[in-house]
A protein has these predicted regions:
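Glycine-rich phosphate-binding loop of ATP-dependent small-molecule kinases
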Residues: 1-214
C-alpha cells in the first residue's frame, strides 16, 4: 500500500513495506447494516484508539477507480448489491496487515461478512499468534436503513443507493450472510451490540464504553 493512498486519520509515516505484524495488536471488527453510520463511527474509533482503518469498500473503490480487472468485476457485483469473492477480499486484508506499523491495532469495516471469511481471518491472524480482540455491532431497524440510504441518495446522487430493489437486496444479503456471525463471536465472548438509534455522539459514547474495556 502506498503512502498516498492512506486515510486522513493517520499519516504516511505509519505505513512501511514489511512482512512483520507487531505483537499485542488489537483487532476490532465493526459490524452494521448499510446506513448504520459505520463510516462516521469508524473515523472516531480510529482517532481515539490509534487504529488503522481497513475498509473493504475503500480498497475496492481504489481498484474500481484504477480500472483494473478486479475493479471492473467488483463494480458489477456491487451495483447489484452482491458481495465480492472471499479470496479477493482476504488477500487484500492480509496485505494491509503486513504494511502497517506505528499503530495500536486495526479496525476492520466490511470484513468479515460471512462465516468462511471469519474463519479465514482467524487463520490469517493465527499465523502470527494473534486473534480478534472484539466485535462491535451497530444495530438499527430495517425501516431506518431504507430511510437513511434513500435520504443519502437524494443528497449525494449515489447511483448504488437510488433503487429500492438494490437497497432491499443489500438488507437481505446483510441479514442472511452476516448475522450468523453473531453466534460465531458470541461463543468466544467477543460480540458486543450497540444501539444505533440516537445522535452520532450518543452512539459513539456507547461504542467507546465497550472499547475502553480492552
Amino acid at each position: 500500500m502506498n503512502s498516498d493512498a492512506t486515510s486522513k486519520t493517520y499519516t504516511s509515516s505509519t505505513l512501511k513495506q514489511n512482512n512483520h505484524i507487531t505483537k499485542d495488536m488489537k483487532y476490532y471488527i465493526l459490524f452494521g447494516p448499510p446506513g448504520a453510520g459505520k463510516g462516521t463511527q469508524a473515523t472516531a474509533m480510529v482517532e481515539k484508539y490509534n487504529l488503522h482503518h481497513i475498509s473493504t469498500g475503500a480498497l475496492l473503490r481504489k481498484e474500481i477507480a484504477a480500472g483494473t480487472e478486479l475493479g471492473l468485476q467488483a463494480k458489477a457485483l456491487i451495483e447489484k448489491g452482491c458481495l465480492v469473492p472471499d479470496e479477493v477480499v482476504e488477500g487484500m486484508i492480509e496485505s494491509e496487515f503486513k504494511t502497517v506499523t506505528g499503530v495500536d491495532g486495526f479496525l476492520l469495516d466490511g470484513f468479515p461478512r460471512t462465516l468462511p471469511q471469519a474463519e479465514a481471518l482467524d487463520a490469517i491472524l493465527a499465523k502470527t499468534g494473534e486473534a480478534v480482540t472484539a466485535t462491535v455491532s451497530i444495530l438499527i431497524p430495517d425501516a431506518m436503513i431504507m430511510e437513511r440510504i434513500k435520504g443519502r441518495a437524494l443528497k449525494e446522487g449515489r447511483a448504488d443507493d437510488a433503487s429500492e430493489d438494490i437497497i432491499n437486496n443489500r438488507i437481505v444479503t446483510y441479514h442472511n450472510q452476516t448475522e450468523p456471525l453473531i453466534e460465531y463471536y458470541e461463543k468466544v465472548e467477543k460480540y458486543h451490540e450497540i444501539d444505533g438509534i440516537g445522535t452520532i455522539e450518543e452512539v459513539q459514547g456507547r461504542i467507546f464504553d465497550v472499547m475502553d474495556k480492552f
